[in-house]
Amino acid sequence: MAEIRKLKNYINGEWVESKTDQYEDVVNPATKEVLCQVPISTKEDIDYAAQTAAEAFETWSKVAVPRRARILFNFQQLLSQHKEELAHLITIENGKNTKEALGEVGRGIENVEFAAGAPSLMMGDSLASIATDVEAANYRYPIGVVGGIAPFNFPMMVPCWMFPMAIALGNTFILKPSERTPLLTEKLVELFEKAGLPKGVFNVVYGAHDVVNGILEHPEIKAISFVGSKPVGEYVYKKGSEHLKRVQSLTGAKNHTIVLNDANLEDTVTNIVGAAFGSAGERCMACAVVTVEEGIADEFMAKLQEKVADIKIGNGLDDGVFLGPVIREDNKKRTLSYIEKGLEEGARLVCDGRENVSDDGYFVGPTIFDNVTTEMTIWKDEIFAPVLSVIRVKNLKEAIEIANKSEFANGACLFTSNSNAIRYFRENIDAGMLGINLGVPAPMAFFPFSGWKSSFFGTLHANGKDSVDFYTRKKVVTARFPAPDFN
């Protein structure tokens, strides 16, 4: 049996062994094969990375903005040339099917493209005359060393929200990727190096609690970007703020989709199946709840079950597979416990994800509950799995009232052909990202990922103009010029 490779951290342009003696298996969730082992690093490792990044900041922050942008452009080109390899790594580590993995790679590349626009993004503003012979200018400067804490479910797209923009704007970066998806991160590092990135500008430290706390507490780290669960995100926001750091914390979701009587059912069902069960439901923009008007509910449920019956479950590398595994055994057990809870609390199980699934990996089939109420646990909690709850409602107003009861407010969608309903939905729903006749309202890189309520802690969101503000600080210069005498 071949020896399992132990991964190293990436600090100061080199792969270095962690100070730890603890390693965790990285497992292919579709096969349970151990791919490698990742270090559960220590605060010593973070100290080294932070000092390295702080030293690199002194020179990197002074590199001309067009030069930084050129390196990001080179990185984008290399990512594009290695799409298939990157997608393969996502599939074997995360479990997504190849099509979904390629889609994630594409979104990651879009984020890098946006960051490559740093020369225009870094521009400040000025006013030639604020008083007699006085002018003022507003300049942007990088903030310093930035820490990023990324999740397993989008191992390329989410880190590419973070470090490309931060680095393009003149910061240096320490990434703590998920310990479940490190091989993809290794490839990103390799390609970023080839793009011409200097040593110390980008660093990677694998780990768990000690690494997170090290990032939150280290005095050299000035800002933190986090994506993950609500409990951890709330902790990151509070503790990071206590240490006087700038923090953005993108957390949980319970996204509601509203289906009105006039919706095109074929398109609606296709979109909802993709939104609810794509990526095994392990995404913060997944459709978790459908509220459907009573007049169309029976027909909707029939078409939904018919569509779900055609879903192929299995290894994402296999042809035709739509639904891959959840990430780990614990996640599978947790999902099965929610199915039991839904039954106990009186919901009607119309598609049972416990049936006809392989034990070769951590598989849960598409699960649909009908007759769900807002008192039920499966409505309240973020399940983060291929589980969909359906609630029948009298009208749009009731559907919005139900959605607005949730503590989460990442996204919400509406399927209708009524323009007045669209406007009413837009003005009254409590959610930061809305979709009209589409299932996943995740915005492009040049718009903010704009969660509300318990889906986000902070002021400045990821992506868009918010990300430029998050990773920079401003300096306003006011200057008086004595009136010249050219006579």
Curated annotation (Swiss-Prot):
It catalyses: 3-oxopropanoate + NAD(+) + CoA + H2O = hydrogencarbonate + acetyl-CoA + NADH + H(+); 2-methyl-3-oxopropanoate + NAD(+) + CoA + H2O = propanoyl-CoA + hydrogencarbonate + NADH + H(+). NAD(+) binds at residues 150, 152, 176, 179-180, 229, 251, 382. Pathway: Polyol metabolism; myo-inositol degradation into acetyl-CoA; acetyl-CoA from myo-inositol: step 7/7. Keywords: NAD, Oxidoreductase. GO terms for molecular function: malonate-semialdehyde dehydrogenase (acetylating) activity; methylmalonate-semialdehyde dehydrogenase (acylating, NAD) activity. Gene3D superfamilies: Aldehyde Dehydrogenase, Chain A, domain 1, Aldehyde Dehydrogenase, Chain A, domain 2. InterPro entries: Ald_DH/histidinol_DH, Ald_DH_C, Ald_DH_CS_CYS, Ald_DH_N, Aldehyde_DH_dom, MeMal-semiAld_DH, MSDH_GmP_bac. The active site is at residue 284. One of its GO terms (biological process) is valine catabolic process. Its EC number is 1.2.1.27. Catalyzes the oxidation of malonate semialdehyde (MSA) and methylmalonate semialdehyde (MMSA) into acetyl-CoA and propanoyl-CoA, respectively. Is involved in a myo-inositol catabolic pathway. Bicarbonate, and not CO2, is the end-product of the enzymatic reaction. Belongs to the aldehyde dehydrogenase family. IolA subfamily. HAMAP family: IolA. This is Malonate-semialdehyde dehydrogenase. It comes from Bacillus subtilis subsp. natto. The gene is iolA.
